[in-house]
C-alpha cells in the first residue's frame, strides 16, 4: 500500500500547471531525445539502458531551492513506484540536477538531497530497493549543475529545465 500524508484527491488544474512548469513547460510530445515519460516506460515490456530515461522537472517535484517533495509530485512518484514494481530486476539510477545559481558545493548537496528524497519516498512507500537476489536496485547520484540541458546564461525561469531529476534504467550486467 502506498502511504500518503495528503488526501487522495489531487487538484487537476494545479497538477497540470505544475507539470507544464516542470521541464521548461514541455509536455510528453516535446520530450528531449532519448527521454521518455514514465507512462511511456510503463508500456515497455522490459527496461534497460536502451529504454531511454525519464526526466522529471524539479519544479514539479520540489519548491525552488528546496529538497522537500511537493504534494503535486505524488502522481509522478506513483508512476515511478509502479514502474519499479513492474520491473523488479531492473536497476534504477536517480540523478539530481540543479541550475547554475549558487556555488558548486551547494548545488551538489541540493541535488543529492533531492535524489535522496525520491529514494526515501519510494522506501517509505514500500518499494523494494533491492532486487530479488538481494543486490541493490536503486542508486542515487548528485550531479549538481554539472550537466545543464539548456544555457546557464539565463535567469531562473530560463534555467528551469536544468532543475530536474532523471531516472535511468539498467539491466543487471549493463554498464
Give residue spans per PLM region.
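Periplasmic peptidoglycan-binding/tethering modules of Gram-negative envelope proteins
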Residues: 1-91, 156, 171-175
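Periplasmic OmpA-like peptidoglycan-binding domain that tethers envelope proteins to the cell wall
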Residues: 98-175
Amino acid at each position: 500500500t502506498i502511504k500518503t500524508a495528503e488526501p487522495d484527491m489531487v487538484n487537476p488544474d494545479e497538477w497540470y500547471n505544475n507539470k507544464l512548469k516542470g521541464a521548461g513547460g514541455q509536455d510528453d510530445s516535446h520530450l528531449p531525445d532519448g527521454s521518455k515519460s514514465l507512462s511511456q516506460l510503463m508500456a515497455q515490456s522490459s527496461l534497460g539502458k536502451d529504454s531511454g530515461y525519464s526526466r522529471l522537472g524539479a519544479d514539479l517535484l520540489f519548491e525552488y531551492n528546496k529538497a522537500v517533495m511537493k504534494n503535486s509530485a505524488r502522481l509522478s512518484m506513483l508512476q515511478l513506484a509502479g514502474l519499479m514494481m513492474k520491473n523488479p530486476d531492473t536497476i534504477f539510477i536517480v540523478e539530481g540536477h540543479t541550475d547554475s545559481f549558487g556555488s558548486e558545493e551547494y548545488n551538489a548537496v541540493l541535488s543529492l538531497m533531492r535524489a535522496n528524497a525520491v529514494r526515501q519516498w519510494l522506501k517509505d512507500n514500500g518499494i523494494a530497493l533491492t532486487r530479488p537476489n538481494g543486490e541493490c536496485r536503486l542508486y542515487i547520484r548528485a550531479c549538481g549543475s554539472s550537466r545543464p540541458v539548456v544555457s546557464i546564461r539565463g535567469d531562473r525561469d530560463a534555467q528551469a529545465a536544468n532543475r530536474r531529476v532523471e531516472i535511468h534504467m539498467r539491466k543487471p550486467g549493463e554498464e
